[in-house]
């Protein structure tokens, strides 16, 4: 803030922050009035998050039939510790398989199939990292304790009593007249979205060699199904 005031002075402008303001921001004695928000701190971000990706493969067969199956399961969460974002996550199951058949010297057949299911949950408000790179640390305090409201401020307490966005029963969402919303408020009060993707693919075919009828002649037939759906 001192350097910011110096920069303004170099441009012929007055100081924006008083010496008293700079002292209070630096002391950290009241982080709600004199905010110093580090959006990369452990208050909001986990040190680590989990991601599991497990794959199993099964194969086998003999001279008549060969089969192969691949099963994959994916599960991951997110780095956030706040609001609905702490429940962000993805689950996915993917199964693929095929069977190749040799019925005799001139007839072969095959079956291929794939099934996948994915579900995702994410907090509404997906601009946390852009806000972290642009939001000034002293711009807002994400949450303010209810205890900071004057006991005689009846109108303020009426707002609290009728609000659905009291966090943990002791905080209300912060903001200013110039910043009436922010990513913290979105993560706590804007809810979440769930998306589901499902797909199924199947194809089967028969190949018949007709060399006994005419050299080089063959017959091929194929049947397939491709289904996909997604909804939020």
Task: Mark where each language-model region is.
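Surface-exposed, low-hydrophobicity segments enriched in Gly/Pro/acidic/Ser residues
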Residues: 13, 24-28, 153-154, 189, ...
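Extracellular loop and loop/strand-boundary signature of outer-membrane beta-barrel proteins
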Residues: 41-44, 79-85, 98, 187-193, ...
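Residues embedded in well-ordered regular secondary structure
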Residues: 1-82
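Outer-membrane beta-barrel domain signature
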Residues: 71-73, 78-79, 83-85, 95-96, ...
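A surface-exposed, glycine/aromatic-enriched loop/edge motif typical of exported proteins
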Residues: 1-22, 116-173, 228-232
């Amino acid at each position: 803030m001192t350097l910011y005031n110096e920069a303004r002075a170099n441009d012929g402008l007055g100081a924006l922050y008083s010496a008293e303001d700079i002292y209070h921001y630096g002391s950290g004695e009241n982080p709600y009035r004199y905010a110093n928000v580090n959006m990369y701190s452990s208050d909001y971000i986990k040190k680590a998050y989990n991601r599991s990706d497990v794959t199993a493969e099964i194969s086998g067969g003999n001279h008549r039939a060969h089969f192969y199956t691949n099963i994959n399961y994916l599960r991951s969460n997110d780095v956030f510790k706040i609001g609905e974002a702490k429940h962000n996550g993805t689950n996915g199951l993917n199964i693929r398989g095929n069977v190749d058949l040799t019925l005799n010297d001139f007839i072969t057949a095959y079956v291929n199939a794939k099934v996948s299911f994915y579900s995702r949950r994410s907090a509404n408000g997906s601009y946390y990292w852009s806000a972290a790179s642009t939001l000034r640390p002293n711009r807002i305090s994400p949450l303010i304790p209810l205890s900071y409201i004057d006991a005689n401020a009846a109108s303020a307490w009426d707002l609290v009593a009728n609000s659905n966005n009291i966090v943990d029963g002791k905080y209300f969402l912060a903001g200013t007249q110039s910043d009436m919303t922010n990513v913290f408020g979105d993560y706590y009060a804007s809810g979440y979205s769930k998306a589901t993707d499902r797909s199924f693919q199947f194809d089967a075919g028969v190949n018949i060699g007709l060399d006994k009828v005419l050299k080089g002649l063959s017959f091929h037939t194929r049947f397939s199904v491709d289904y996909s759906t997604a909804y939020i």
